[in-house]
Every structure is written in C-alpha cells, then in structure tokens.
Regions:
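Membrane-interface interhelical connector segments
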Residues: 137, 141-145, 175-189
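Polytopic transmembrane helical bundles with strong interfacial aromatic enrichment
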Residues: 1-140, 148-168, 195-228
Length: 228
C-alpha cells in the first residue's frame, strides 16, 4: 500500500517515513510472536503443513531489512532508490503471505481462495492503516489534498467487499481433508464465533468504511479518521 499510494500521489516525506517505521515496528512484533509461538500441527482438529514454517520469519526479517533501507532512502531523499526498494518490499511481503497460506491450505477446499482471502485481508489492513495515518497527518495541516484519503478509503472498501465474498464462498465449501475428531465436524454456521466474524469482522467494517468514504469526499477528515 505504501508503494501504491506513494506512486500515485505526492505524499509528504514525513508521512512516508512514519508509515514505513510503523510497518517495521509491526513486523518486529510479528517476528517475535512467531518465534515464541510456533504454528501447531493442527488447529481445531484440522492438520496444518509446517514444513515451510521456518521460511515465514525469514521472509519477515528480509522484509524488515528492505523497509529499513527504504526508510533510510526516504529520510535522505534518495528518490531513485525509493521505488525499487518499495517494489522489493511488496514482492517479499506477498511471498510471506503465500507461505502463510501454504501452511493452512491443506484442509481448505481451494488453496487459491485461501491465498486470495489472506491477500485481500492484508490489503484491507494496509489500506485502512494508510488512510488512518493520512487522516492524522491531515489534521496537523488542513492544506493537504483530500484525494489521497478518498482513494485510500475507496480502495479499503472494495477490498473489504471482495474479502467478504471470498469468506462467504469459502464458508459454504466443505473441508478437503477430514478432521482429527468429531467435534470439528460441527456445522460452522451454528457457531457463534462464525457470526461474530461476519458481523464484527466484515459487516461493521464495510459500513464504517462506506461512511468514511462519504465523509472524505466532503472534506470531513476528522470523521473519516475516526471511522477508520
């Protein structure tokens, strides 16, 4: 997201630097969590594939290094190196998502849907983060253009809708591999946590992002930032 929006709009150097440093902080936390909590061999009775587990933290470490270099290029205004570094970070980040998807793809009916689900979920997180951060930047300087916020909000809304469609399709499909116990055979749609995932995780964010988009179009950056 940092690569896409920085290429499309004239974003301030301070904003780009803050965004890259924030992502680096999140990556460091993710690396620590993965190292301290290895992925189990099964989740809720369904087997996981942990053969490529060690490559996930390695890819995150590589991504952290590339983003650190990008932050240095932004700070020193080395414009010629910013785009290649951002592109490399996007490729390594996508690789990390694909590795994570491969770990949980065994019980999934379609590995493609699982990978798309993770990709769109990551795009939602990235779009919302960039928009929220730009909203805070706008509050410190009202002269900034509203177009980046409108595009970021619209992008997040579209990804949320596509993410929801994939979740609905995936929930209707059976597991491709049998679970280890009969408890895991319970109907998914009878579980409260499933509907919490749909309501709190999808329907509410779509409504909030739709309101944020309309607020951004009329210049209500404070409302947009709060909703996101």
């Amino acid at each position: 997201m940092l690569n896409i929006f920085s290429y499309k709009y004239e974003l301030t150097r301070g904003y780009l630097l803050t965004a890259s440093l924030s992502i680096i902080s999140a990556l460091l936390i993710s690396i620590i969590i993965i190292l301290l909590n290895p992925i189990p061999s099964s989740i809720d009775g369904f087997q996981t594939d942990v053969t490529d587990e060690t490559f996930i933290p390695i890819s995150l470490v590589a991504l952290t290094g590339i983003l650190s270099a990008l932050s240095l290029f932004i700070r020193r205004q080395t414009i010629s190196l910013q785009t290649p570094a951002a592109t490399a970070a996007s490729i390594v980040g996508l690789l990390a998502i694909l590795l994570l998807g491969a770990t949980f793809s065994e019980p999934a009916w379609s590995a493609i849907l699982l990978h798309l689900n993770l990709i769109f979920g990551s795009l939602v997180l990235g779009g919302a983060f960039m928009a929220m951060l730009w909203g805070h930047w706008y509050l410190t300087s009202g002269s900034l253009p509203k177009e980046p916020m409108v595009s970021m909000s619209l992008f997040t809304l579209v990804c949320l809708i596509l993410h929801s469609i994939i979740v609905i399709i995936s929930s209707l499909l059976p597991a491709s591999s049998p679970p280890e116990n009969e408890i895991s055979l319970a109907v998914l749609h009878m579980e409260l946590t499933f509907w919490l995932r749909i309501g709190v995780g999808l329907i509410f964010p779509i409504a909030a992002t739709w309101l944020a988009l309309h607020a951004a179009r009329i210049g209500g950056m404070m409302s947009t930032t709060g909703l996101l």
